[in-house]
Amino acid sequence: MFSQEVMDMLIKGIGETLYMTLGATIFGYVLGLPMGILMTTTAKDGIRPNAGVYKVLDVIVNIGRSIPFLILLILLMPLTKAIVGKSYGSTATIVPLVISAAPFIARMVESSLNEVDAGVIEAAKSMGASTMQIITKVMLVEARTSLVVGVTITLGTVLGYSAMAGTIGGGGLGDIAIRYGYYRYQADIM
């Protein structure tokens, strides 16, 4: 059906797409998970209310989520070049993917943790659990299913973003789709 050259190109594109998607999701969770936990705990009905911290994080997350990815990708080119040394390719694409994914993840985590029954948290407090114990042994455990669903949604979102990155040389399947499917109109590769 396809020549060996096309198959090699597609396999390389799949590899680059997986590299960008998984790498950005992992680093996105490194940033977004603590942000989401902090937002939940510092909310007015959280276990350690702090309006100032919550408002700052809420504004950061809202701004981060409201910027369209393609615009963010272009805006972050200088930062990407400073961090990676170039602003194109699959490794360089991870930087804007992480910056875009982290606020999304933070909101997903916040939403998941807010679903935890307040009675369970109150029971842990009454038994003398510390804030860290409530977070790690009650909230994260009780929200486990919702958090896993959040990971799958995040992976799908980041995968879509990585395809968009191909429009400006981000590599992966998005790059192949633009170069061969759109510019050359080779429908068989699409």
State the predicted function of each range.
Residues M1-D8, I168:
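Short membrane-interfacial helix/loop motifs at transmembrane-helix boundaries
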Residues G170-M190:
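Interhelical loop and adjacent transmembrane-helix boundary motif
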Residues V6-L10, Q186-A187:
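Primarily residues marking transmembrane-helix entry/exit sites
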Residues L113-A143, Y183:
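Short helix-to-coil transition segments within interhelical loops
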Residues M9-N114, V149-G156:
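Membrane-water interface segments at the C-terminal ends of transmembrane alpha-helices
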Residues T91, V120, T131-Q133, T145, ...:
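Residue-level recognition of membrane-helix boundary sites in multi-pass small-molecule transporters
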Residues T131-S162:
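Transmembrane alpha-helices
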